[in-house]
Amino acid sequence: MKTIIHAKNIDKKVRLALYGMLHHSATKLFPRRMKNVSIKLHLKHHIYDGEAMIEEEYSDRNPKHFKIIIDPYRIAIDDWGRELNYSEWVSTLLRTLAHEMVHVKQYIMRELTFKKGAMCWNNMKVGWMSEEEYYCAPQEVEAYGLEKWLQLSYTASWNKIESGEI
């Protein structure tokens, strides 16, 4: 898997953790298709906390090239308006990346597609008008469910590496 991270003012340890989470998530979610996939991760201002998309210049019939955008400024504040401390921010950053990697998996496995401009989940059109409908959409139910598992399993591996057990 080819990965590139575009980010400014991010320390080396966090950058390594992001590369690690990209690889860990791909290994868990789409191990047989990893070698053909390329992912560009951008940390920059964005209208959403995070978004995964098929790269525009490539076909969406058999997607292999992806772009993930995460807004590190937006995720620095929790749902109650509290500013996160550094370790909470890093944890949220990794969890958001895990969530977006689930969407990448959905694109790769053709579970999440776009037909005639409409988003489809397993060939059924899905759309939402409200925040409640967004959280009930099948692709989001899966992504929110798997993000925590990916984060916990990756953190356990990272802690073993840091302590010298691996």
Set out the residue ranges of the language-model regions.
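Short alpha-helix carrying the canonical HExxH Zn2+-binding catalytic motif
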Residues: 89-105
